[in-house]
Amino acid sequence: MIDEILRDAEQRMKKSIELLRQELAGIRAGRAAPSLLEHLEVNYYGTPTPLNQLATISAPEARLLVVQVWDRNAVSAVEKAIRQSELGLNPSVDGQTLRIQLPPLTEERRRQLVKLVHEEVEETKVAIRNIRRDALADIKELLKNKEISEDDERRAEQRLQDLTNRYIAEADKLGKQKEHDILEI
């Protein structure tokens, strides 16, 4: 039962870290990266659709993204989604191809992005701690129902804490990496 609780907690913590990876990939660093636009939602025939399901995104140059839209009718919807995103990008349309020149990041914008990274990392750490809290409650419930001994409870709590520390360290590492990428000129 304890192993099941810990396994469930670890799975949920892994999902939190994966979500953080996706969020950080969407935050622009100094160079163009297709991941910046991949999960951008496009209103495609009334349905929110990720951009990577409507187009091929590439970065042929350090400050240029090229979006090759597969459906001619979706070009204006893709352009609108990119313009309205919080990324501050201005695509130029050439047939079914959108070219997006990325302006160099100003020092102020870099600081804003670093702040955003810190917020995302903190959100993930809070989510991980909430997962720990839920698992602890489950362990306490087992003790209360006399399904485990106090020694088992203490060992389970220690294993859970080790798990929590590992995933929080992972979140911090991802945040520091992204911060370094943003501040790198």
Curated annotation (Swiss-Prot):
GO terms for cellular component: cytoplasm. Belongs to the RRF family. This is Ribosome-recycling factor. It comes from Thermomicrobium roseum (strain ATCC 27502 / DSM 5159 / P-2). The keyword Cytoplasm applies. One of its GO terms (biological process) is translational termination. Keywords: Cytoplasm, Protein biosynthesis. Responsible for the release of ribosomes from messenger RNA at the termination of protein biosynthesis. May increase the efficiency of translation by recycling ribosomes from one round of translation to another. One of its GO terms (molecular function) is ribosomal large subunit binding. CDD domains: RRF (cd00520). It is found in: Cytoplasm.
